[in-house]
């Protein structure tokens, strides 16, 4: 396995957990572009996807996952189980936390 395996389940089919390193997380907080936000407000009136916010959320989640993976690798893990997201928004600031349990797995 070349890269970090990340799953939302507590186990990985075909593997066994041989060591548990504990909780790991990656946190990203970003502010929205005020000029972009003004244009996106019109979308809330007429309906439809708000592309700017969708991209912001996607990028923020990807960054959070990357930071979580770095923390897990630093602990010696090769997988993360029970991965979840938590997010919050306050005014023009979006925060996303990716978290899970860092483990070492090996093929059965």
UniProtKB/Swiss-Prot annotation:
Family matches, as InterPro entries: UPF0145_dom_sf, UPF0145_YbjQ-like
SUPFAM superfamilies the UniProt entry points to: YbjQ-like
Domain of life: Bacteria
Similarity annotation: Belongs to the UPF0145 family.
PANTHER family, A to Z: UPF0145 PROTEIN SCO3412 (PTHR34068:SF2), UPF0145 PROTEIN YBJQ (PTHR34068)
HAMAP family recorded: UPF0145
Record-given protein name: UPF0145 protein llmg_1596
């Amino acid at each position: 396995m070349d890269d970090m395996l990340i799953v939302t389940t507590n186990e990985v089919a075909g593997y066994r957990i041989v060591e548990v390193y504990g909780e790991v997380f990656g946190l990203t907080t970003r502010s929205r572009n005020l000029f972009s936000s003004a244009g996106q407000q019109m979308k809330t009136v007429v309906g439809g996807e708000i592309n700017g916010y969708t991209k912001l959320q996607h990028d923020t989640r990807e960054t959070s996952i990357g930071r979580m993976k770095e923390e897990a690798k630093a602990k010696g893990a090769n997988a993360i189980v029970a991965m979840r997201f938590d997010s919050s928004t306050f005014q023009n600031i979006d925060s996303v936390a990716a978290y899970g349990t860092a483990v070492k797995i090996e093929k059965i």
